[in-house]
Amino acid sequence: MIQPPIGKKVLVEVPSTTANLGPGFDCLGAALSLTNFFTIKRIDGDSERFELIMESTEGNHLRGGPENLFYRAAQRVWKAAEVEPFALEARVKLAVPPARGLGSSATAIVAGLVGANALINDPLSKEKLLELAIDIEGHPDNVVPSLLGGLCFTAKAASQRWRVVKCDWDDSIKAVVAIPSLRLSTSEARRVMPKTVPLGDAVMNLGSLTLLLNGLRTGRQDLITDGMHDRLHEPYRWKLIKGGAQVCEAAINAGAFGCAISGAGPSILALCKEDKGRNISQAMVKAWESEGVASRAPLLNLQTKGSTWYSNQSK
């Protein structure tokens, strides 16, 4: 397959994601209406040249070079499509802050895969991109909804194949995501978790997940409230998030159906009806402020379309 001409570029939009939603550890994730934008261009130079230009204050510590996560994803596309690697430039506008539990690394992986594939005229199927994304990230709960959009349940079947189920999400349900100035790496959040859990905790999580999925499908508040309880990861992770329990309590008192750590944290997800969103947002920000932590708490929708790309001529 022939390399694209120097100067060819595409714009890739990739949504943020919230993973786990309480009981769905490492298998449930949803795309949200907070989006990163990547303008990707083939440039002249050595095949390992990767120029990263940040057009926002978020992520200004990130660097280019061949070890960059975005560029590593692009290289996986070229290898699968049997294309010789080429130099790239990526201009990035980040709305999804790194190390906050909103799938920032997943947006980089998905943008690298989708953008590199688009530059060489989309030879790889979405199914192949999905396989590559999970392999790079190591778990599916962020990259799958980031690529496909919506609420996604992903599991490795007994056949060792990844199976993805798009789940229904009632339009009346909105998400308030409180994003603190704190940072928390996924590796740190995983280190505090035990290698085994009591059988009763595992059974409780199965029940909670079933209630949550049915509540999200029907919009029933009682099912969401009872379903957003977890015993596999949250009991061990709350201690890493300063003021997290108080923020969650404030959201519930302001009218949220339920609360959960977003991904590995430290951001906190609250599900609610739209008319409660503003009060919940203010309550969560105030609760963190009382702990000396600055934050913001946007009211977000489910993003259903997933990642999309546009040619330079069309956008």
Curated annotation (Swiss-Prot):
InterPro entries: GHMP_kinase_C_dom, GHMP_kinase_C_sf, GHMP_kinase_N_dom, GHMP_knse_ATP-bd_CS, Homoserine_kinase, Ribosomal_Su5_D2-typ_SF, Ribsml_uS5_D2-typ_fold_subgr. Pathway: Amino-acid biosynthesis; L-threonine biosynthesis; L-threonine from L-aspartate: step 4/5. Its EC number is 2.7.1.39. Pfam families: GHMP_kinases_C, GHMP_kinases_N. It comes from the Bacteria. One of its GO terms (cellular component) is cytoplasm. It catalyses: L-homoserine + ATP = O-phospho-L-homoserine + ADP + H(+). Gene3D superfamilies: 3.30.230.10, GHMP kinase, C-terminal domain (3.30.70.890). GO terms for biological process: threonine biosynthetic process. Belongs to the GHMP kinase family. Homoserine kinase subfamily. This is Homoserine kinase. It comes from Prochlorococcus marinus (strain SARG / CCMP1375 / SS120).
